[in-house]
Each structure stands twice: as structure tokens, then as C-alpha cells.
Amino acid sequence: MAKKSKQLCAALEKIDSTKAYSVEEAVALAKETNFAKFDATVEVAYNLNIDVKKADQQIRGAMVLPNGTGKTSRVLVFARGAKAEEAKAAGADFVGEDDLVAKINDGWLDFDVVIATPDMMALVGRLGRVLGPRNLMPNPKTGTVTMDVAKAVEESKGGKITYRADRAGNVQAIIGKVSFEAEKLVENFKAFNETIQKAKPATAKGTYVTNLTITTTQGVGIKVDVNSL
């Protein structure tokens, strides 16, 4: 514990808490101050000036990062017949119907993404209490309820991330791993930021992005200058 505190203090000394950094500076600092003994995840956290209580100000979606996430997602697909075969051919880790529902209800959760064809949603709906709180419920807005299961599987395996604003207007997302070259992380950030900017509700007033930080697993939050975006 003392060693971890020492590492944290060393990281804090390199970061000026009163300063808002450019994206490039923040990424460089995130890599430099990371003290995890594993390949830590690099994340961004936005605070948006939106009112998610209003239907037209809810932000949710998915995108594929240009350089991936550095993580291999375990993909589960609910499909039958030809669509099930398409999912398997595309690289899905688990494909099934009632058998998977029973397994999940018994407590099995060894997967990261759930995809379903529209005709399977009545079945998948039985898992709402299990999948919903874990943000695993398939949804058309994130491209996980679709007839094009092959594309959905390939995207999920190739760096697709999902995002959603919480009740306070916070949006968090992975943009890669500490082991990524800084340029790759910056490219991923810029792609995600462009998506967030395009998602700005027409009815949102005032400054859209009120706060933005970049951090690593167990790392220190580094404030990004929102005016530099």
C-alpha cells in the first residue's frame, strides 16, 4: 500500500492540477504517470451540459475506433438458422438461443458483448434484469440488434465501443491501452470526440463539453482543455 501511495505521489508531482492540457499533452502524461503493473486501459470522461431527462437530449451510440481498443471482446450472439451460422463464421464466441438464456440465468456471464437478431429479442427480453444493469442488453442504437450479425460481430471484435450519457451527463469510453503509441491514442480520442460533438442535441444550450479528463486504470485524471477541441 505504501509503495502504491509513493507511486501515486510521484505521478501527482508530474501533473499540474490547475492546468488544462492539450489532448497530446494529456495522452503523453497519462502514459508517463501510469504505474500499473499491467497494460492499463486509457479512458476519457466527458461531462456534458445536457438534460438527459429530455428525450431529445439523451446521448447513446456506438463507434469503431480507428486503432481498436487493445482488448479482445468475447461476443455472444442470439440467433438461429442461417444467421447463427453467419455469426459463427464471423468469429462469435458463443451462439445460441434458449440454451444461452438458461446458462445466463444460472449465473454465467463470461462475455463482453451481446448481439441479437430482431426476432430473438422476445427471448432475450427475459434477461433484462441480468443484462440491463451491466449495459449488455442488445439495442438498435448501438447496432447490437441487427440482421447483419456478421458485421456486428466483426465490429465488436475490431474495436467497437459503446457510450451512453448517465443522469448527470457524464460519458466515459475506452480509447486504448497504455502500450499504444501516443499517436494512436490521440487518433482514437479525436475519432471519439468527433462522434460526441456530432451527437450534440440541437436543444442543448450553453457550453456543451464542460469538463474532460483522460486517465488510466488506477491512474490520475488529467484535465483536457475543452477549448482546444
UniProtKB/Swiss-Prot annotation:
Known role: Binds directly to 23S rRNA. The L1 stalk is quite mobile in the ribosome, and is involved in E site tRNA release. Protein L1 is also a translational repressor protein, it controls the translation of the L11 operon by binding to its mRNA.
GO MF annotation, one: tRNA binding
Upper lineage: Bacteria, Bacillati, Bacillota, Bacilli, Lactobacillales
Alphabetized CDD domains for the sequence: Ribosomal_L1
Homology family: Belongs to the universal ribosomal protein uL1 family.
Species in which this protein is naturally found: Streptococcus pneumoniae (strain Taiwan19F-14)
GO biological process: regulation of translation; translation
Alphabetical list of InterPro entries matching this protein: Ribosom_uL1_bac-type (IPR005878), Ribosomal_uL1 (IPR002143), Ribosomal_uL1-like (IPR023674), Ribosomal_uL1/biogenesis (IPR028364), Ribosomal_uL1_3-a/b-sand (IPR016095), Ribosomal_uL1_CS (IPR023673)
Domain of life: Bacteria
Subunit structure: Part of the 50S ribosomal subunit.
Record keywords: Repressor, Ribonucleoprotein, Ribosomal protein, RNA-binding, rRNA-binding, Translation regulation, tRNA-binding
One Pfam family linked to the record: Ribosomal_L1
Gene coding for it: rplA
Protein's UniProt name: Large ribosomal subunit protein uL1
A GO cellular component entry from the record: large ribosomal subunit
